[in-house]
Amino acid sequence: MASSSRSVLLLVAALFAVFLGSAHGIAKVPPGPNITATYGDEWLDAKSTWYGKPTGAGPKDNGGACGYKDVDKPPFSGMTGCGNTPIFKDGRGCGSCFEIKCTKPESCSGEPVTVHITDDNEEPIAPYHFDLSGHAFGSMAKKGEEQKLRSAGELELKFRRVKCKYPDGTKPTFHVEKGSNPNYLALLVKYIDGDGDVVAVDIKEKGKDKWIELKESWGAVWRVDTPDKLTGPFTVRYTTEGGTKGEAEDVIPEGWKADTAYEAK
């Protein structure tokens, strides 16, 4: 969307918020336009809060609405957060990456840091709202002033979408979810370089030509129900929001097991 169009939409959202605040006493700010993979490198305004432990990764179970596990550990390493509707996008924003920075209060470093979207938030406090892990929120501070910044509670920040760059050796990973069986397969897709988020997933059994389309289940989880037993090995094909396709050949082996993660070769 062009910059001028985005500005008009944000102005309308702000005016509508004022109306709601006058009518009901509480300003419920409508969300801004969706931030897509083709959005560009323009810095936008947002509000930021934080949740969980001060130096933690957010959720108590180190998970979140995307379905990822252990977001406190590499490669996410606690640099995570919840996005509101135009960022989380009903799960299609899971895995996307954003640079964020703050300049006020004085404890802000002004230097950008990168966060991954791993969770959802519904607080209508701004067109764009990042509810960050305590660790990610503190990372915007000058060295040694992390807790001072966290004590601010809520900040104005600048953000922009960027390509995800995982550490060397990180491979696309497909977690076969609990409850999967030969007639039902659910895959959690994670660690996708580039766009980070995924909009389509298909599988193909070894020796067959037909691709089987998976449907969105929730968060970053994709599923398929089939009357024919799925035995594997499977190649997984995924498409990112920007249209990039990737294939992980025979990544799900014959004799696959539920609640098990398989890395691309």
UniProtKB/Swiss-Prot annotation:
One GO-annotated biological process of the protein: plant-type cell wall loosening
Any single GO CC term annotated in Swiss-Prot or TrEMBL for this entry: extracellular region
Keyword Thylakoid carried by entry: no
Top-level lineage group: Eukaryota
Domain Expansin-like CBD: 183-264
Domain Expansin-like EG45: 63-169
Gene3D superfamilies, alphabetized: Expansin, cellulose-binding-like domain (2.60.40.760), RlpA-like domain (2.40.40.10)
UniProt keyword Secreted present: yes
CDD domains: DPBB_EXPB_N
Signal sequence residues: 1-25
Location in or out of the cell: Secreted
InterPro entries assigned to the protein according to its UniProt record, in alphabetical order: Expan_Lol_pI, Expansin/allergen_DPBB_dom, Expansin_CBD, Expansin_CBD_sf, LolPI, RlpA-like_DPBB, RlpA-like_sf
Glycosites: N34
Primary site of residence: secreted
Alphabetic keyword roster: Allergen, Glycoprotein, Secreted, Signal
Entry similarity comment: Belongs to the expansin family. Expansin B subfamily.
Name used for this protein in its record: Major pollen allergen Hol l 1
